[in-house]
Design a protein with these regions (language model features):
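Charged, glycine-rich intrinsically disordered N-terminal tails and low-complexity linkers that flank
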Residues: 1-118, 304
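Catalytic cores of nuclease domains that cleave nucleic-acid phosphodiester backbones
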Residues: 4, 100-222
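Intrinsically disordered, low-complexity coil segments
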Residues: 29-30, 63-71, 168-176, 249-251, ...
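Short, surface-exposed secondary-structure junctions/capping segments
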Residues: 52-56, 60, 213-215, 289-291
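Glycine-rich, flexible loop segments associated with nucleotide phosphate handling
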Residues: 93-104, 219-233
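Metal-dependent nuclease catalytic regions and adjoining charged, substrate-binding loops involved
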Residues: 217-219, 226-304
């Protein structure tokens, strides 16, 4: 990996924006998993094929016909194209409608990512410039804070670290975790972690799962948490907090904050719980999975 492609670096750990990859310059062959990618592994998988078919059928059916079919589809979470003949819908028309749904999703995701990147850059620059105190006030922080561009040592008494690259490698080298904290504020040993979210909305609860008759939960061992983006974000900030306390056990996590800017420009601040127990369960489970995969590969190598 060429150094000229590096977007950000903290010690030996580097990040490349184009590929969204983290690596150690002393051992680039050993992969890191990002905090957000790891958390996504424990979210319920999104069946894009089913849900695009579901939305396409909704678009093609009358309101009364859709009311009849909707319940069955939600109960089974399976789509059989034989249903099309019952309503004289050609497969070509259905495929076109489904592709239209998929294309709309892809465009919405592209536009959302572009908007998010622009807002993150704007917020980062505001912390370096004269608007620093104004930005910090959004997180309920006042007073004089120091901010040095590309400075990574966590030794400023009253310091602000925007887009802070953080990593953790377990002593045995099995767990290799990295991520970027949008806004790290250090006041003595008190730590505030802020994160900017620019998606359409923050879901505080997950949808109702008709098979379990309860709100959808994340996958084991996080099945005590609702499977909604607020839970995912709480885990993200909690993982950053856990990593910081591994760097310095004297750090006190004062607050974990989500600063949400919706698509209408409305700004909302959410306080998150520090889910330390859940983070440690997740990391232990993931580490066990890595070890199992490594053992499986070793067994395959000795087979003849």
């Amino acid at each position: 990996m060429a150094n000229e492609n590096v977007t950000k670096q903290n010690g030996n750990i580097c990040f490349i924006e184009d590929t969204h990859k983290y690596f150690d310059i002393t051992a680039p062959e050993k992969p890191f998993i990002s905090v957000t990618t790891l958390i996504h592994r424990y979210a319920q998988p999104f069946d894009k094929e089913f849900w695009s078919a579901y939305k396409a059928l909704e678009k093609l059916l009358s309101k009364d016909a859709w009311t009849i079919e909707k319940k069955s589809l939600l109960n089974t979470k399976k789509f059989d194209k034989e249903i099309l003949a019952s309503y004289n819908i050609s497969e070509n028309d259905f495929n076109a409608a489904q592709q239209g749904i998929l294309d709309a999703w892809a465009e919405k995701n592209r536009a959302s990512c572009e908007r998010g990147t622009q807002i993150h850059l704007m917020m980062e620059n505001s912390v370096y410039g004269s608007d620093r105190s104004k930005t910090l006030k959004k997180f309920g922080v006042g007073g004089k804070f120091e901010c040095k561009k590309d400075y990574t040592e966590l030794d400023l008494e009253h310091g602000v670290y925007p887009e802070y690259l953080i990593s953790r490698v377990s002593k045995d080298g099995v767990l290799r975790l990295a991520g970027q904290i949008d806004l790290l504020i250090k006041n003595g040993n008190e730590i505030l972690i802020g994160d900017y979210k620019t998606n359409e909305k923050i879901d505080l609860k997950s949808g109702f799962d008709t098979t379990t008759k309860s709100n959808a939960k994340m996958l084991y061992p996080l099945n005590n948490l609702m499977d909604c983006n607020f839970s995912h974000y709480q885990l993200q900030l909690s993982t950053y907090a856990w990593m910081l306390q591994k760097i310095n056990p004297e750090f006190i996590i004062k607050d974990l904050l989500l600063y949400h800017i919706d698509h209408q420009g409305n700004e909302t601040l959410y306080h998150c719980d520090y889910l330390k127990d859940e983070v440690e369960r997740m990391l232990l489970h993931y580490k066990k999975q890595i070890i199992k995969e490594q053992q499986k590969l070793k067994r395959q190598r000795i087979e003849y």
